[in-house]
Protein backbone atom coordinates (compact mmCIF):
# COMPACT_ATOMS: atom_id res chain seq x y z
CA UNK A 1 0.00 0.00 0.00
CA UNK A 2 1.36 3.41 -0.97
CA UNK A 3 2.12 5.65 1.96
CA UNK A 4 0.21 8.91 1.94
CA UNK A 5 2.98 11.06 3.40
CA UNK A 6 6.75 10.80 3.68
CA UNK A 7 8.27 12.91 6.45
CA UNK A 8 11.99 13.58 6.29
CA UNK A 9 13.35 14.27 9.78
CA UNK A 10 16.68 16.09 9.81
CA UNK A 11 18.57 14.73 12.83
CA UNK A 12 21.81 16.45 13.76
CA UNK A 13 22.72 16.86 17.45
CA UNK A 14 19.05 16.89 18.48
CA UNK A 15 19.22 14.01 20.96
CA UNK A 16 17.51 16.20 23.56
CA UNK A 17 14.46 16.76 21.37
CA UNK A 18 14.19 13.86 18.92
CA UNK A 19 11.87 11.64 20.97
CA UNK A 20 9.40 14.50 21.36
CA UNK A 21 9.52 15.06 17.61
CA UNK A 22 8.98 11.40 16.72
CA UNK A 23 6.24 10.92 19.32
CA UNK A 24 4.30 13.81 17.83
CA UNK A 25 3.78 11.78 14.62
CA UNK A 26 2.37 8.73 16.39
CA UNK A 27 -1.34 9.41 16.17
CA UNK A 28 -2.89 5.91 16.09
CA UNK A 29 -5.46 6.60 13.39
CA UNK A 30 -2.92 7.97 10.88
CA UNK A 31 0.47 6.39 11.61
CA UNK A 32 -0.12 3.56 9.13
CA UNK A 33 -0.24 6.16 6.36
CA UNK A 34 3.21 7.51 7.21
CA UNK A 35 6.73 6.85 6.01
CA UNK A 36 9.09 8.63 8.41
CA UNK A 37 12.73 8.86 7.37
CA UNK A 38 15.01 9.69 10.30
CA UNK A 39 18.11 11.02 8.58
CA UNK A 40 21.14 11.00 10.87
CA UNK A 41 23.35 13.67 9.34
CA UNK A 42 26.64 12.37 10.71
CA UNK A 43 25.61 13.01 14.28
CA UNK A 44 26.79 9.79 15.93
CA UNK A 45 25.29 6.94 17.92
CA UNK A 46 23.09 9.00 20.22
CA UNK A 47 20.68 9.70 17.37
CA UNK A 48 20.81 6.07 16.22
CA UNK A 49 19.93 4.73 19.67
CA UNK A 50 16.81 6.88 19.82
CA UNK A 51 15.82 6.22 16.21
CA UNK A 52 16.29 2.46 16.44
CA UNK A 53 13.77 2.25 19.28
CA UNK A 54 11.12 3.66 16.96
CA UNK A 55 12.21 1.53 14.01
CA UNK A 56 11.91 -1.58 16.21
CA UNK A 57 8.49 -0.61 17.53
CA UNK A 58 7.04 0.63 14.23
CA UNK A 59 9.07 -0.98 11.41
CA UNK A 60 6.45 -0.12 8.79
CA UNK A 61 6.51 3.56 9.75
CA UNK A 62 10.08 4.56 10.64
CA UNK A 63 13.30 4.08 8.72
CA UNK A 64 16.77 5.17 9.87
CA UNK A 65 19.17 6.51 7.26
CA UNK A 66 22.78 7.18 8.22
CA UNK A 67 24.85 9.54 6.09
CA UNK A 68 27.95 11.68 6.31
CA UNK A 69 27.39 15.19 7.56
CA UNK A 70 26.21 17.46 4.78
CA UNK A 71 23.94 20.00 6.43
CA UNK A 72 20.20 20.49 6.34
CA UNK A 73 20.01 20.71 2.57
CA UNK A 74 21.63 17.30 2.24
CA UNK A 75 19.00 15.70 4.49
CA UNK A 76 16.21 17.15 2.37
CA UNK A 77 17.92 15.99 -0.83
CA UNK A 78 18.32 12.48 0.59
CA UNK A 79 14.76 12.47 1.88
CA UNK A 80 13.39 13.33 -1.55
CA UNK A 81 15.51 10.57 -3.12
CA UNK A 82 14.28 7.96 -0.64
CA UNK A 83 10.65 9.07 -0.40
CA UNK A 84 7.92 6.70 -1.55
CA UNK A 85 4.90 8.52 -0.15
CA UNK A 86 2.37 10.40 -2.27
CA UNK A 87 3.29 13.67 -0.51
CA UNK A 88 6.46 14.91 1.18
CA UNK A 89 7.13 17.10 4.19
CA UNK A 90 10.34 17.95 6.01
CA UNK A 91 10.48 18.42 9.79
CA UNK A 92 13.52 19.44 11.83
CA UNK A 93 14.52 17.01 14.55
CA UNK A 94 13.95 19.59 17.29
CA UNK A 95 10.47 20.64 16.12
CA UNK A 96 7.10 18.85 16.24
CA UNK A 97 3.63 18.57 14.73
CA UNK A 98 0.30 19.45 16.31
CA UNK A 99 -1.95 16.39 16.65
CA UNK A 100 -5.31 17.69 15.41
CA UNK A 101 -3.88 19.62 12.49
CA UNK A 102 -1.65 16.69 11.54
CA UNK A 103 -4.58 14.27 11.55
CA UNK A 104 -6.59 16.69 9.39
CA UNK A 105 -3.69 16.99 6.96
CA UNK A 106 -3.41 13.20 6.56
CA UNK A 107 -7.16 12.88 6.05
CA UNK A 108 -7.00 15.46 3.27
CA UNK A 109 -3.90 13.98 1.64
CA UNK A 110 -5.64 10.64 1.11
CA UNK A 111 -7.87 12.20 -1.55
CA UNK A 112 -5.74 15.22 -2.50
CA UNK A 113 -4.64 15.99 -6.04
CA UNK A 114 -3.03 19.42 -5.54
CA UNK A 115 0.69 19.95 -6.05
CA UNK A 116 1.12 21.99 -2.87
CA UNK A 117 -0.74 21.75 0.43
CA UNK A 118 -0.33 24.76 2.72
CA UNK A 119 -1.00 24.60 6.44
CA UNK A 120 -0.42 27.39 8.94
CA UNK A 121 2.30 26.77 11.51
CA UNK A 122 2.90 27.87 15.08
CA UNK A 123 5.86 28.78 17.24
CA UNK A 124 6.35 27.40 20.73
CA UNK A 125 8.72 28.29 23.56
CA UNK A 126 11.70 26.00 24.00
CA UNK A 127 11.71 26.44 27.76
CA UNK A 128 8.03 26.08 28.59
CA UNK A 129 6.65 24.31 25.53
CA UNK A 130 3.86 26.88 25.41
CA UNK A 131 2.27 27.92 22.13
CA UNK A 132 3.47 31.48 21.37
CA UNK A 133 1.67 32.44 18.17
CA UNK A 134 0.31 31.14 14.87
CA UNK A 135 1.81 32.18 11.54
CA UNK A 136 -1.01 32.40 9.01
CA UNK A 137 -1.08 32.81 5.24
CA UNK A 138 -3.74 35.43 4.63
CA UNK A 139 -5.13 36.83 1.40
CA UNK A 140 -8.39 38.41 0.32
CA UNK A 141 -11.18 35.92 -0.26
CA UNK A 142 -9.17 32.95 1.00
CA UNK A 143 -11.23 29.79 1.42
CA UNK A 144 -9.84 26.83 3.32
CA UNK A 145 -10.14 23.55 1.47
CA UNK A 146 -10.60 25.18 -1.93
CA UNK A 147 -8.26 24.16 -4.73
CA UNK A 148 -6.65 27.21 -6.38
CA UNK A 149 -4.53 27.66 -9.44
CA UNK A 150 -1.22 28.79 -7.97
CA UNK A 151 -0.96 31.61 -10.49
CA UNK A 152 -4.29 33.04 -9.36
CA UNK A 153 -3.23 33.63 -5.75
CA UNK A 154 0.56 33.77 -5.66
CA UNK A 155 0.68 37.57 -5.87
CA UNK A 156 -1.19 37.73 -2.55
CA UNK A 157 0.79 35.32 -0.40
CA UNK A 158 4.31 34.05 0.27
CA UNK A 159 4.53 30.52 1.61
CA UNK A 160 6.99 29.55 4.34
CA UNK A 161 8.90 26.26 4.31
CA UNK A 162 7.22 25.01 7.50
CA UNK A 163 3.81 25.43 5.87
CA UNK A 164 4.55 23.30 2.81
CA UNK A 165 3.63 19.76 1.90
CA UNK A 166 4.57 18.98 -1.72
CA UNK A 167 3.52 16.20 -4.04
CA UNK A 168 6.56 13.94 -3.99
CA UNK A 169 6.59 13.34 -7.74
CA UNK A 170 6.95 17.08 -8.25
CA UNK A 171 10.03 17.30 -6.01
CA UNK A 172 11.67 14.39 -7.77
CA UNK A 173 11.33 16.32 -11.04
CA UNK A 174 13.31 19.30 -9.77
CA UNK A 175 16.49 19.97 -11.73
CA UNK A 176 18.18 21.69 -8.79
CA UNK A 177 19.15 20.20 -5.46
CA UNK A 178 19.41 22.15 -2.24
CA UNK A 179 22.84 23.39 -1.24
CA UNK A 180 24.78 21.08 1.05
CA UNK A 181 27.17 22.03 3.85
CA UNK A 182 25.23 25.28 3.97
CA UNK A 183 22.69 27.06 6.17
CA UNK A 184 19.71 29.11 4.90
CA UNK A 185 18.48 26.65 2.26
CA UNK A 186 14.82 27.14 3.22
CA UNK A 187 14.35 29.64 0.39
CA UNK A 188 15.66 27.09 -2.11
CA UNK A 189 13.11 24.55 -0.89
CA UNK A 190 10.37 27.14 -1.23
CA UNK A 191 11.33 28.42 -4.69
CA UNK A 192 12.94 25.60 -6.67
CA UNK A 193 9.64 23.65 -6.98
CA UNK A 194 7.62 26.66 -8.19
CA UNK A 195 8.03 25.95 -11.94
CA UNK A 196 6.18 22.66 -11.33
CA UNK A 197 3.45 23.87 -8.96
CA UNK A 198 0.12 24.35 -10.71
CA UNK A 199 -2.42 23.87 -7.91
CA UNK A 200 -2.49 24.71 -4.22
CA UNK A 201 -4.91 24.28 -1.32
CA UNK A 202 -4.91 25.86 2.16
CA UNK A 203 -6.00 23.89 5.22
CA UNK A 204 -7.20 25.57 8.39
CA UNK A 205 -5.51 23.90 11.34
CA UNK A 206 -1.83 24.60 12.09
CA UNK A 207 0.40 21.55 11.70
CA UNK A 208 4.09 22.41 12.13
CA UNK A 209 5.42 23.52 15.51
CA UNK A 210 8.63 25.56 15.32
CA UNK A 211 10.75 25.61 18.49
CA UNK A 212 11.69 29.19 19.37
CA UNK A 213 14.45 30.24 21.72
CA UNK A 214 17.44 28.07 20.89
CA UNK A 215 20.51 30.29 21.11
CA UNK A 216 22.31 28.32 18.39
CA UNK A 217 19.55 28.69 15.79
CA UNK A 218 20.86 29.71 12.38
CA UNK A 219 18.58 32.77 12.28
CA UNK A 220 20.28 34.21 15.38
CA UNK A 221 22.14 37.32 14.19
CA UNK A 222 25.48 36.15 15.60
CA UNK A 223 25.07 32.89 13.71
CA UNK A 224 24.15 34.81 10.56
CA UNK A 225 27.30 36.92 10.87
CA UNK A 226 29.42 33.82 11.38
CA UNK A 227 27.82 32.09 8.39
CA UNK A 228 27.63 35.13 6.14
CA UNK A 229 29.31 33.23 3.29
CA UNK A 230 26.64 30.52 3.47
CA UNK A 231 23.95 33.14 3.02
CA UNK A 232 25.85 34.66 0.09
CA UNK A 233 26.07 31.22 -1.53
CA UNK A 234 22.33 30.64 -1.26
CA UNK A 235 21.62 34.11 -2.66
CA UNK A 236 23.91 33.47 -5.64
CA UNK A 237 22.27 30.13 -6.40
CA UNK A 238 18.79 31.65 -6.14
CA UNK A 239 19.80 34.39 -8.56
CA UNK A 240 21.15 31.72 -10.93
CA UNK A 241 17.88 29.79 -10.63
CA UNK A 242 15.85 32.91 -11.34
CA UNK A 243 18.04 33.75 -14.33
CA UNK A 244 17.46 30.28 -15.78
CA UNK A 245 13.76 30.00 -14.98
CA UNK A 246 12.46 33.52 -15.62
CA UNK A 247 12.18 32.99 -19.39
CA UNK A 248 9.85 30.00 -19.01
CA UNK A 249 7.80 31.00 -15.96
CA UNK A 250 4.40 32.62 -16.25
CA UNK A 251 4.34 36.29 -15.26
CA UNK A 252 2.66 35.47 -11.94
CA UNK A 253 5.18 32.79 -11.02
CA UNK A 254 8.01 35.04 -12.13
CA UNK A 255 6.83 37.78 -9.75
CA UNK A 256 6.55 35.23 -6.94
CA UNK A 257 10.13 34.05 -7.45
CA UNK A 258 11.33 37.65 -7.71
CA UNK A 259 9.75 38.47 -4.35
CA UNK A 260 11.28 35.38 -2.79
CA UNK A 261 14.80 36.12 -4.03
CA UNK A 262 14.40 39.79 -3.07
CA UNK A 263 13.70 38.70 0.51
CA UNK A 264 17.02 36.89 0.62
CA UNK A 265 18.77 39.91 -0.90
CA UNK A 266 17.34 42.09 1.88
CA UNK A 267 18.44 39.54 4.49
CA UNK A 268 21.95 39.66 3.04
CA UNK A 269 22.00 43.44 3.38
CA UNK A 270 20.83 43.12 6.98
CA UNK A 271 23.76 40.82 7.72
CA UNK A 272 26.19 43.33 6.23
CA UNK A 273 24.54 46.15 8.19
CA UNK A 274 24.71 44.19 11.44
CA UNK A 275 28.51 44.29 11.47
CA UNK A 276 30.30 47.26 13.00
CA UNK A 277 30.30 49.95 10.28
CA UNK A 278 33.24 49.63 7.93
CA UNK A 279 34.00 50.46 4.34
CA UNK A 280 34.11 46.81 3.31
CA UNK A 281 30.47 46.21 4.28
CA UNK A 282 29.25 49.37 2.59
CA UNK A 283 31.15 48.36 -0.54
CA UNK A 284 29.61 44.89 -0.48
CA UNK A 285 26.10 46.35 -0.29
CA UNK A 286 26.75 48.76 -3.15
CA UNK A 287 28.41 46.14 -5.35
CA UNK A 288 25.74 43.51 -4.70
CA UNK A 289 22.90 45.93 -5.30
CA UNK A 290 24.45 47.30 -8.49
CA UNK A 291 24.92 43.80 -9.90
CA UNK A 292 21.37 42.75 -9.09
CA UNK A 293 20.01 45.96 -10.63
CA UNK A 294 21.96 45.31 -13.83
CA UNK A 295 21.57 41.54 -14.22
CA UNK A 296 18.31 40.82 -12.37
CA UNK A 297 16.17 43.98 -12.55
CA UNK A 298 13.01 42.08 -11.62
CA UNK A 299 14.54 41.03 -8.31
CA UNK A 300 15.91 44.54 -7.72
CA UNK A 301 12.47 46.08 -8.22
CA UNK A 302 10.77 43.44 -6.07
CA UNK A 303 12.50 44.66 -2.90
CA UNK A 304 9.77 45.91 -0.55
CA UNK A 305 11.89 46.74 2.49
CA UNK A 306 11.57 50.46 3.21
CA UNK A 307 15.02 50.74 4.83
CA UNK A 308 16.73 49.29 1.76
CA UNK A 309 14.73 51.59 -0.50
CA UNK A 310 15.76 54.60 1.60
CA UNK A 311 19.39 53.49 1.56
CA UNK A 312 19.25 53.28 -2.23
CA UNK A 313 17.64 56.69 -2.59
CA UNK A 314 20.40 58.23 -0.47
CA UNK A 315 23.06 56.81 -2.75
CA UNK A 316 24.10 54.72 0.29
CA UNK A 317 25.09 57.87 2.18
CA UNK A 318 22.79 56.71 4.97
CA UNK A 319 24.85 53.55 5.44
CA UNK A 320 26.29 54.57 8.88
CA UNK A 321 22.83 55.36 10.24
CA UNK A 322 21.33 52.23 8.69
CA UNK A 323 24.05 50.10 10.24
CA UNK A 324 23.56 51.72 13.64
CA UNK A 325 19.80 51.13 13.48
CA UNK A 326 20.27 47.52 12.41
CA UNK A 327 22.80 46.81 15.15
CA UNK A 328 20.50 48.37 17.73
CA UNK A 329 17.57 46.27 16.51
CA UNK A 330 19.62 43.07 16.77
CA UNK A 331 21.33 44.09 20.05
CA UNK A 332 24.73 43.67 18.43
CA UNK A 333 27.86 44.39 20.44
CA UNK A 334 31.27 45.33 19.08
CA UNK A 335 32.15 41.74 18.13
CA UNK A 336 31.56 40.08 14.78
CA UNK A 337 33.74 42.30 12.59
Provide a role label for each language-model segment.
Residues 67-83:
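Glycine-rich, basic loop-to-helix element that forms the pyrophosphate-binding segment
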Residues 40-49, 71:
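A conserved acidic beta->alpha catalytic loop
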Residues 88:
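Short aromatic/hydrophobic "clamp" motif used to bind/position activated sugar donors
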Residues 114, 273-337:
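Membrane-interface aromatic/basic loop that binds lipid-linked glycans or pyrophosphate carriers
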Residues 33-42, 63-68:
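Short beta-strand/loop segment that forms part of the nucleotide-sugar
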Residues 14-27:
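Short, well-formed alpha-helical segments that are part of the catalytic scaffolds
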Residues 19, 45-54, 100:
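Acidic helix N-cap motif at the loop->helix transition within catalytic regions
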Residues 72, 76, 93-201, 208-225:
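Donor-binding/catalytic cores of nucleotide-activated saccharide
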